[in-house]
Amino acid sequence: MTQSPFPDDLTRRPPNYFAFGGIDRSAHVREQEGWLDAVVARPDTRLVPVWRSRNLFADLGNRVMPPVAALPTVVEAGRLLDLAQEVVFLGDFQGIAHVAVDLSPLDEEMVGTMTGTWGQFSDLREIGPLIERFEGAVMAYARGLMFWHARHGFCGVCGSPTVSAKGGHQRNCTNPDCGASHFPRTDPAVIMLVHDGDRALLGRQKIWPQGMYSTLAGFVEPGESLEEAVAREVFEESGIHI
């Protein structure tokens, strides 16, 4: 069994469903030749399907039980590996490898035919903490990496095509005169709750469902402190100075 690299007390803290799932990302083995092929050949490896930034869930129609992630094994859904635009190793959890597969090129009818046995695709943000903690984290992880792959198919330095490397955690430029490597990165951002006593400042987008509101948020600009970003974003989104 793969030992988690994190202390047990971290997994017992109040959960962040989209960030910490205790998965061992095994970065030290990603460079080994043929390693990913061996991972996807294991019958018990679990697949984390992603389709156009949506994740696969089972039991969405059950109003009694909470939804659960649909994570079929290679034995059950190995054909998805042949259809995937990208195959990315996520890590090991309790001795089981988890691999994300991007099915975005498939149209809605085809993806429904290929995955309908296990569930249906839905927006993870709409389900959030209703699902089990590890499932939420691994689904967000898979969705984030596939989002990055979809937007870095070409080199930002010379414009040549890039190819996936190191289990899907790097993309390399195919131009021998360039050879740039690109990595997934998280942009710094602020999410803030502005309040005045028992009142809170919330915002919404026109496309959101009626009655849906959110705290304000935004990206941190170069050379800007977190506090400055909060003040700027609040003014930009609401016209209120803090």
Could you tell me what each predicted segment is?
Residues 129-147:
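Short, charged surface segments at domain edges that flank catalytic/cofactor-binding sites
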